[in-house]
Every structure is written in C-alpha cells, then in structure tokens.
Amino acid sequence: MPTYRSKTSTAGRNMAGARSLWRATGMKDDDFSKPIIAVVNSFTQFVPGHVHLKDLGQLVAREIEAAGGVAKEFNTIAVDDGIAMGHDGMLYSLPSRDIIADSVEYMVNAHCADAMVCISNCDKITPGMLMAAMRLNIPVIFVSGGPMEAGKTRLANPVTKAIEVKKLDLVDAMVIAVDPSYSDAEVAEVERSACPTCGSCSGMFTANSMNCLTEALGLSLPGNGTVVATHADREQLFKRAGRRIVELTRQHYEQDDERVLPRSVGFKAFENAMTLDIAMGGSTNTILHLLAIAQEAGIDFTMKDIDRLSRVVPQLCKVAPNTNKYHIEDVHRAGGIMAILGELDRAGKLHTDVPTVHTPSLKDALDQWDIVRTQDDAVRTFYQAGPAGVPTQVAFSQNTRWPSLDLDRAEGCIRSYEHAFSKEGGLAVLTGNIALDGCVVKTAGVDESILVFEGTAHVTESQDEAVENILNDKVKAGDVVIVRYEGPKGGPGMQEMLYPTSYIKSKGLGKACALLTDGRFSGGTSGLSIGHCSPEAAAGGAIGLVRDGDKIRIDIPNRTINVLVSDEELARRREEQNAKGWKPAQPRPRKVSAALKAYAKLVMSADKGAVRDLSLLDD
C-alpha cells in the first residue's frame, strides 16, 4: 500500500518545524491526517486564456476541502503565443513548456503533495503540465479555462460586396491586416471583434486541441475542451474536479489502485489522443507535445505511430482555421469531444478499454456522454451550452443555450465515418531526402488542388527574412518558401510561423505556394505549410542543404517530400556545409539570451518532441 507522500513533511516528531510552517499557512491539527492536493494554477493578466483564472484555483480548493482534502495553490508561468508572435518573444514560447513542467515538479516534490488539479488553458501550459503529470505520476485531473467565444462582425463580401455577418478569430485579424482590399476602418473593426471574451482562441488551434486531447487521454472531465469559458456550465467542471481528485487520491493511497495514476493511461490512450487529433484536424503542435508527453511517461510512442494512424483515421470534424463555418463552440453543440470519440468508436478506430478520471473505462464514458447513444437528458442539455455574444473577461458569466443540438452526422460539424470529410485524417507525416526523420502537415487545411505540389525553393534563413520577402512580393506563385535554422536548437526555441503563412494567404498565394520549415506552426495555420522538418538544419538536417532554385516535390497522398537533387550533389553540399558549420550563411541580428542558449544545448529535434537529450547529462 503506498504511503501518502505528504507524511514526509507532516508526520513524526522530527517534522515539528515543517508542521509549524504548515500551520502558518492555515493548517489545523486535523488537517495533518488529510491528503495535501496541489492546485496548479496558471493565472496571468498577460494572456486572455488565463486572465479569468485568478479565482478559479480557490473555487477548486474549496471543493477539495469540502471533500476532505487540504488544498494548496501555486502558479506557473504562461506565455501567450499570439502576443509573442512575429518578434523575438516567440523564441521563449516552446522553452516555456519545459520551464512549466520543471516548476510543477519542483513545487510538488519540494512540498510532498499527494495529488494535483492542473488548471491550464493555452498553448504550452497544458503540455507542460501534462509532462509534469507523467513525470510525477501522482493522481491528477486537468481542467482548462475553456475556449473563447468566436468573434462576429459585419463586413463586405470581397466578391459580391454585400454586407455579411462574419464569424472571426485571431487569424482573421492577422490576415485582413495585410490585405490592401480592406480599409483601415474595417481592419480596426475586425481587430476589436476577433477576440471578444476571455478564453483560449476560438478555433481548433493548439490550446483547444490540447485541451480536447486531455479528454481522449482520460485525464479531464467531458466538456473540458469545448464548453466556452464564459458559460456557467464550466463552473461545474471545476467543482467536480475538486471533489473527484480527493476520491482518486484515496483510491491510490488507501486502496492501492494504480489505475488512477496518469501513467496508467498507457500506449492505447496515446493512440486514442492522436486518433482524435487526426480526426478533428487539430494543430500540428499537438504532435510535438504528445511525443514529449509520451517520453515523460516512458511510453514508446513515435512519429512512426503517428504516420501509421494518419493513413487510416478519417477526418470527422473540420473547424477554424480549416473552415470559416465552425468554431469550438460549434463542436460543443454537436456533442463535443465525446461525440467525435463516439464516431471513432463506431468506426472501429478507438481503444475503449482504457481508464478515465471519471469512469472505469472510456467505454463507460461514451455510454454516458456520447449524445448519439446516451439516454441522459442532462447530458444533452449540457452540450447545448453556447455563446452569449457579449464581450467579457469574466468566467461563468452567462447561461445561454443553443435551441437545438447539431446531430447531423452527414453534413454537420461532426461527421460519421460514412460521411467523413476525408477517409484519411487531418494530419500527415511526410518523409524523404529533405526530412529523413519526418515533417508534419495539417492536411485539413490544404486545398485538394495542391496535395501534390512541385515548386522552386525560395530559401530564407529566418522567419524575419521570410516575412520581409513575402511582404515585398519576392515570393511568387510556384515557390516553396524554405525557412530554416528556426528549429528547437537553431532558433533557438522553434518559432511558430503564423505570420509567414498568414501573409502568403493575404497575398493570394494560399493555393500557389508551399512553406517548409524546421520551425513549427501556430494552430491557426492553414495552407500547404509543412513544419517540424527533422533533423533540423542546426543539427545537420538536409533542409540546410537546399539552395535557391532547387525543385522540391511534395506528395501528401504518398507521404513524401524530396528535393530533386542527386544523392551525389547532396553529399557534396554536406561536405561543404560541414566545413562551414551548420549555421545561417549570414549572422542574424538576433539576441539570444543565456537562458535560450542553455535550452539549445540540450534540446533535440522535433521528431523527438523537442525534449531535452538527457544522455548529455550522464556522468
């Protein structure tokens, strides 16, 4: 029977000093016999996805205490990728994932907490906390701050000129801002309307993708990924999480039940999470994060597994940025993540014998929460929770209900296998002589006309250079824009390339160009945008051998990407590059801090999840 970790600092005469300090935090005599549960919050006023979390940690804490536990809250950092985008601030985004994981480990182990509730939301915070959860392997429940409501405004149709109500998100503001066909007044209106409420950005971007994946991993409650941040129903998720974590903690320490530990989810749950991601056309960043989380869990889940799944899993859901028709609030109306998992189950694409934090198995969860099969009217009412359309930074501030559910599995937001958007899913892994260890593309955002594309290399050696060339019309139709030395080591920090892809789209080249990088993309990216090219240029990857004018062939159906240069020529170029060193041809005006240099020393390429190479720490 495992011993409560907290007893290390609360039991025995020799811990009198520690207990004295615990008492100074408000603990009483009878509290020392209770489990100590960490409430891991990520409140910050810098990030709209986290601006409303300040009081929610204490909301969870009160429920923990009412259920018989002791709650102790602390905070992690949180970087807003959208605000950090397009300047050197983005160098810090991916490294912050590891800082978050480390900070959770430090706090929980230093204070011997028995379990934790992780309150996350945006891009690197959920993955960082998931990495920590797997590393610590103590009972945990995730509850996110929830998605933002989609924005709305009235704009003239660029073709018909008729005034239309248009749903908006962050990416629309970026694209329209550099489109000369829109007036300054229209750009200002979109800017003010695109992000109307607190919450994670409203499309199937990285933050929402990861919060949805926690449901598939079995580590959060149904609705975690899809109930909008402003809706009163989300308050119940926080309260239930607080009560449930006490039950899970007792199951582990008092009943020796290892099924409640995060590592118990196993390989099958990682397959389920990736299957969901492919089916819903999630962010390519989720691949990076799942690989990293699997490494922390000690699970051998690799790019080969992702490639295998991408060939057999259908795309059942298409949401912004892959379409303007649907946002996360529409996914919820169609039954949320449990509905997508239900359709995958009926298609024979899911492992349902894995545990969740709220049911003994995923099968039990689907029986209760899949709106196609449930008999529970309360569940149906839950999935009618909708947006109010009122700008606010206040959580749980409205109780709007959709008049009906979206149960149309032929033409609705969520499709059945028979009516899938495509029989192959929304993500693909490509390999070839330019990416020996693979690269990834969100096929859900690629127009069918360019699934096979042959173009001319336009080489840039930083995101800044790529943006400058695109805006100055140096990039032409038929080009493959190469953005290299932006990987985890080469950046350092593996910047997101949302600005280059948005500007390509705004220049009318979205169906006429491709972009290939050893960096990564925002979840808001669409188009023929291929990232995570591994090995990266700074690690000797072949993307560093490409030259202006080389022909590059991309074949998504056959999962290949190649520079059309002979092996002999590539070998000659490699010898030349070895002599020069694997770095940009010209020094970049980029200030790299000591913290980023330390990160670059240990980090591996994207195909390994951009985690630290721990072998470098061996004696």
From Swiss-Prot:
Protein name: Dihydroxy-acid dehydratase 1
Sequence similarity: Belongs to the IlvD/Edd family.
Cofactor remark from the record: Binds 1 [2Fe-2S] cluster per subunit. This cluster acts as a Lewis acid cofactor.
Positions annotated as active site in the UniProt record: S522 (proton acceptor)
Oligomeric form and interacting partners: Homodimer.
Annotated EC: 4.2.1.9
GO biological process, one term: L-valine biosynthetic process
Family annotation (SUPFAM superfamilies): IlvD/EDD N-terminal domain-like, LeuD/IlvD-like
Modified residues (N6-carboxylysine): K124
Pathway: Amino-acid biosynthesis; L-isoleucine biosynthesis; L-isoleucine from 2-oxobutanoate: step 3/4; Amino-acid biosynthesis; L-valine biosynthesis; L-valine from pyruvate: step 3/4
Binding, [2Fe-2S] cluster: C122, C201
This protein's GO CC annotations: cytosol
Binding site for Mg(2+): D81, D123, K124, E496
Natural source organism: Burkholderia lata (strain ATCC 17760 / DSM 23089 / LMG 22485 / NCIMB 9086 / R18194 / 383)
Reactions it catalyzes: (2R)-2,3-dihydroxy-3-methylbutanoate = 3-methyl-2-oxobutanoate + H2O; (2R,3R)-2,3-dihydroxy-3-methylpentanoate = (S)-3-methyl-2-oxopentanoate + H2O
Cofactor(s), names only, from the UniProt record: [2Fe-2S] cluster; Mg(2+)
Function, in words: Functions in the biosynthesis of branched-chain amino acids. Catalyzes the dehydration of (2R,3R)-2,3-dihydroxy-3-methylpentanoate (2,3-dihydroxy-3-methylvalerate) into 2-oxo-3-methylpentanoate (2-oxo-3-methylvalerate) and of (2R)-2,3-dihydroxy-3-methylbutanoate (2,3-dihydroxyisovalerate) into 2-oxo-3-methylbutanoate (2-oxoisovalerate), the penultimate precursor to L-isoleucine and L-valine, respectively.
Molecular-function GO terms, alphabetical: 2 iron, 2 sulfur cluster binding; dihydroxy-acid dehydratase activity; magnesium ion binding
Keywords: 2Fe-2S, Amino-acid biosynthesis, Branched-chain amino acid biosynthesis, Iron, Iron-sulfur, Lyase, Magnesium, Metal-binding
